Amino acid sequence: MTLTIAELARALDARLWGDGSLIVNGAAEAGQAGEGQIALATSPAYAEKLSPGGMALLAEGADPEALGLRAAILVGRPRLAMAGLTRAFDPGPGIAPGIHPSAVIDPTAELPEDAAIGPFVVIGPRVRIGAGARIASHVSIGADTVIGRDALIHAGVRIAHGVTIGDRVILNPGVSLGADGFSFVTPEKSGVEEIRQSLGERQEIRQQHWTRIHSLGGLEIDDDVEIGANSTVDRGTIRATRIGRGTKIDNLVQVGHNCVVGEDCLLCGLVGVAGSARIGNRVVLGGQVGVSDNIFVGDDVIAGGATKIFTNAPAGRVLLGSPAVRMETHVEAQKNIRRLPRLYAQVAELRETVKKLLDKGDVE
């Protein structure tokens, strides 16, 4: 992809400074930009590393002339501009048009004329795939699955039977969609059930054997969802598991059976959402956050990294810690924990003082 810097500025809806005819063929970090590359220097610390005579993406308020640049694009929101810039120069996964001869496609499957399907892809009976689909090598798609328009499915993705996927969905390598939920039951009350009711007390420990509850529900992924590498979303037991429009899921995330995740959520790496949990819209779960089963996390909740949510979380709450509490409560608690050694020393000193007074008989 090659653009003039003026064309790139227009694409980003940003202000151009300097020579708009310069050719841009890529981007690089400040101090590493070569010929034809625009340097990313949206903070003063990065701007100091710029080489004179080049091109840069700068935050509004920077002085390109003082930095010795030939041209610059000035933006009000640098990270949003980064989204547009990286999109302009992303070559994509390079999946060749057409259907690779090694692909195994059931004759009842419906594929678009413009499909790009890589080597060793397996597509099952009655699958329907929308226009513009790009499917990389070693992907398997189970029977009766429906995939919308402009899907990008990277290598090694596994999609089980009866999954419904919307338009413009991106699935990164190793994603697993629609596997059976983790549902098991014992003939008698299990130890897990007992301690959940008693909050830790056990009457007796006895043998128990697990019986599988089969997963008859489906999985519904809405439009514009992105799912990171090696993440898994299980199908429902009776009703469908659902992921809402525009939600982005990072690598190594587990979403359990029957879960409902709302629209425009962010689930960062190593998040685990247990079965039948419901998550509202625009929720952000930081890395390693855990959500207990059968609870509700309200709209616009933000949970910091490694937070463990065991009970319902009201809308708009900012959470941190294990168990999850308001962020300000957690921060204050951590401050108090750091004060404990000093407090311990003060108490020890007071005890010693009182002991001396008692020994001298000055205190009754």
Curated annotation (Swiss-Prot):
A GO MF annotation of the entry reads: N-acyltransferase activity
Q: Which GO terms describe its biological process?
A: lipid A biosynthetic process
The catalytic residues are 257
Q: Enzyme class, one word?
A: transferase
| CDD domains, sorted | LbH_LpxD (cd03352)
Catalytic activity, reaction form: a UDP-3-O-[(3R)-3-hydroxyacyl]-alpha-D-glucosamine + a (3R)-hydroxyacyl-[ACP] = a UDP-2-N,3-O-bis[(3R)-3-hydroxyacyl]-alpha-D-glucosamine + holo-[ACP] + H(+)
Q: Name one GO cellular component term.
A: membrane
Family the UniProt entry places it in: Belongs to the transferase hexapeptide repeat family. LpxD subfamily.
What does the protein in this record do? Catalyzes the N-acylation of UDP-3-O-acylglucosamine using 3-hydroxyacyl-ACP as the acyl donor. Is involved in the biosynthesis of lipid A, a phosphorylated glycolipid that anchors the lipopolysaccharide to the outer membrane of the cell.
Q: What is this protein called?
A: UDP-3-O-acylglucosamine N-acyltransferase
What is this protein's gene name? lpxD
